[in-house]
């Protein structure tokens, strides 16, 4: 922060026109891949201005803010699941004992799906049977997408009639053979149905909880015809399971 203040003190940031990102702020910029890409641009600009920085110094911060849920690989296709950002809405006023309250809808979460070595003409990535709008990152065979889902169902939330979407089942589907090559599952809570009674005491316990909620099995059996991938023109990187 001090380096940025010093850099702008010497050379104020005075563009002719600020970029209007529109819905991209709630689409690709919520995914850790593009957050890190944007951060590396900032580090490069600081180095050009005479402030020696290395983006690898901040790799632990990336892992802490966007923890890895798990990965899966089959036939040279590597799939990685990682936490992403999800802004929560503040609801309207509701009656509460002794007055009124405004609850926060914390039931929604977002997960990043990143794939390497994917031939998009033949294979597709699905979440709960729905094909993901995988977008190229600019690297051959590398694609990324986000999944927005309801993790739990509190008494006060937007769209109260929409149920919980977990566990999330991800499949690597062969479109030609109409079958899943394999897949993985991610559970938001304990897969056995238990409720965590206390908060994790440190980062190691939190990581162990995440790892026990991820399984490298549990793909969809039988014939799968995923059909055509539907992409929202306003949110091309995001699959919102609430709209399915």
Where are these regions (language model features)?
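C-terminal accessory/tail domains of diverse enzymes
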Residues: 1-244
């Amino acid at each position: 922060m001090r380096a940025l203040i010093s850099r702008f003190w010497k050379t104020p940031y005075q563009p002719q026109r600020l970029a209007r990102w529109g819905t991209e702020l709630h689409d690709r910029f919520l995914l850790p891949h593009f957050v890190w890409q944007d951060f590396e641009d900032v580090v490069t600009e600081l180095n050009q201005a005479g402030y020696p920085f290395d983006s690898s110094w901040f790799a632990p911060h990336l892992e802490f803010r966007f923890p890895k849920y798990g990965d899966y690989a089959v036939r040279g296709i590597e799939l990685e699941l990682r936490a992403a950002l999800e802004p929560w809405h503040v609801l309207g006023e509701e009656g509460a004992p002794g007055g009124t309250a405004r609850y926060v809808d914390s039931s929604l979460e977002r997960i990043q799906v990143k794939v390497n070595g994917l031939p998009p003409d033949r294979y597709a990535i699905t979440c709960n049977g729905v094909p993901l709008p995988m977008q190229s990152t600019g690297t051959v065979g590398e694609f990324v997408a986000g999944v927005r889902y309801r993790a739990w169902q509190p008494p006060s939330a937007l769209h109260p009639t929409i149920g919980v979407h977990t566990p999330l089942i991800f499949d690597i589907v062969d479109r030609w053979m109409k079958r899943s090559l394999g897949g993985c599952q991610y559970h938001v809570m304990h897969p056995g149905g238990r409720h965590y009674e206390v908060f994790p005491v440190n980062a190691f316990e939190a990581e162990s909880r995440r790892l026990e909620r991820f399984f490298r099995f549990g793909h969809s059996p039988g014939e799968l015809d995923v059909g055509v991938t539907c992409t929202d023109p306003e949110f091309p990187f995001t699959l919102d399971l609430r709209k399915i």
